[in-house]
Amino acid sequence: QVTQFIMGKLSHYELSYLLPHFLKENRGKMSVYFTRVFNPVWTYPDGFSWIEALRDESKVGLHIALTPTWNETAYFADYVLPMGHSSERHDLISYETHAGMWIAYRQPVLREYARRQGKEPEFTYQANPGEVWEEDEFWIELSWRIDPEGKLGVKEHFLSPYREGEKLTIDEYYR
C-alpha cells in the first residue's frame, strides 16, 4: 500500500506516472503528498487522471506543492510553498552537453554573500528575498519537527555524521 510518507517512511523523489492509477484502483491512500517542481497535470499524457486523484480527499488527504512558479498541478494543492530558483538554493547539476562526464555545484548567492559580510544565517531563507526556503533545509527541518524524539524513524535520516545526535546542517549535507 502507498501510505505514510509515500512507500515507506521516506521517499525523496516523485513517484511514477502510475500513481493516480494505483490510487484509483484502491492500492492505497496518500495521507500527505508533496509535489516538488512537478507538474504532472501538464506534463504527463494522462493529466486528467492526476486532477481526479488530487481532488479526491479519500485518495490524497493533503497535497502540498513546492514550486518556484504557479502551475496547473499547484492549482489543485491544499498549500503552495515557494521554492527557490537556482540562485536561491544548493543544487548538484549535470547535463548531457558533450561526451564528457562532469558535475556542477550551485549554492545560494545571497547566503554566500551574507557569509562574506560576516553574517551566518542559520537557514538560507533568512538571506533569500521573500524568505523562500531552500528545499534541502526545508526537508531537514520538517523531518525534525515531525519526529522530534526520533520514535517514527524519520529523524535518523537527518542526523549529522560529524556531531552525534545533532541535526544535519546544509553545509554538512554537501560536504
Regions inferred by a protein language model and the residue ranges of each:
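Non-catalytic alpha/beta scaffold blocks inside enzyme catalytic domains
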Residues: 1-172
